[in-house]
A protein has these predicted regions:
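Hydrophobic hinge/microswitch elements
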Residues: 1-13, 18-19, 70-125
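Extended ligand-binding regions for polar small-molecule ligands
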Residues: 57-58, 140-163
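Secondary-structure junction motif
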Residues: 62-84, 147-151, 155
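Short helix-loop capping/hinge motifs at secondary-structure junctions, enriched
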Residues: 45-55, 131-133, 144-150
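Beta-alpha-beta core module
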Residues: 25-31, 35-37, 97-145
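Generic preference for hydrophobic
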Residues: 17, 29, 40, 64, ...
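Flexible hinge/capping segments at coil-to-helix
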Residues: 27-38, 42-64
C-alpha cells in the first residue's frame, strides 16, 4: 500500500485503489461500493478445513501467514492485548505468495476473499473470519491533480459509477 501511495504522491500514477488504512485526508477519494471479507486460506485437506468460519480467538497458536500491511495496520486492532499467543511464521506482499505458502503447509494465510484461486481443484480453500471489520476500498488521487483528458474522462466515469 505504501509503495502505491508513494508512486501516487510522486505523480507516477493518476489513481490508486486502496483499502481503509490509507490517510484519506491526504487525497481526494471515492468510496467503492464493494467491501471485502477477511478470512483464512488453508490446504483443502487440513483438519481445520471442516470449520465453516473462524474467529480471531481461533487463530491463536496457529502458524499464520499474513500480509505485511495487515500486520502493520489491522493486526494490533484484531488481537488487542492478546498478542502473546499469535504465531506469525511469514509475511507476504502479494496474495499469490501467501496462498503458495499456505498450500505448501507452512501455515494459514490471512487475506481478503477472492484474491486467489480457491476453487475445487486449487488445493486450497477460504474460510471467512467472523467479527472483524470488512475491508473498505477507495479510489484515491492527489489533491489539486491536473489530469490528462483521458484521466479526466476516467475520473468522470468513476464518479458516475460510485456515487
Amino acid at each position: 500500500m505504501q509503495d502505491v501511495c508513494e508512486k501516487l504522491d510522486k505523480g507516477l500514477l493518476d489513481f490508486a485503489i486502496v483499502m481503509n488504512y490509507v490517510d484519506l485526508m491526504k487525497y481526494n477519494y471515492l468510496p467503492m461500493s464493494t467491501k471485502d471479507k477477511w478470512g483464512v486460506v488453508m490446504r483443502q485437506d487440513d483438519p481445520l478445513a471442516e470449520k465453516e468460519s473462524f474467529s480471531v480467538s481461533d487463530l491463536k497458536g496457529l502458524p499464520l501467514i499474513c500480509s505485511k500491511q495487515w500486520v502493520d495496520q489491522e493486526f494490533p486492532q484484531w488481537f488487542q492485548s492478546d498478542l502473546g499467543d499469535v504465531n506469525i511464521v511469514a509475511t507476504y506482499n502479494l496474495p499469490f505468495n501467501g496462498a503458495v505458502m499456505a498450500k505448501s503447509g507452512m501455515g494459514y494465510a490471512l487475506m481478503l476473499d477472492n484474491l486467489v484461486n480457491t476453487s475445487a481443484g486449487s488445493g486450497i480453500l477460504f474460510r471467512p473470519l467472523l467479527n472483524v471489520p470488512d475491508a473498505e476500498m477507495y479510489v484515491i488521487w492527489r489533491k489539486y491533480q491536473v489530469f490528462t483528458p483521458i484521466a479526466e474522462l476516467l475520473l468522470n466515469e468513476l464518479q458516475a459509477s460510485f456515487r
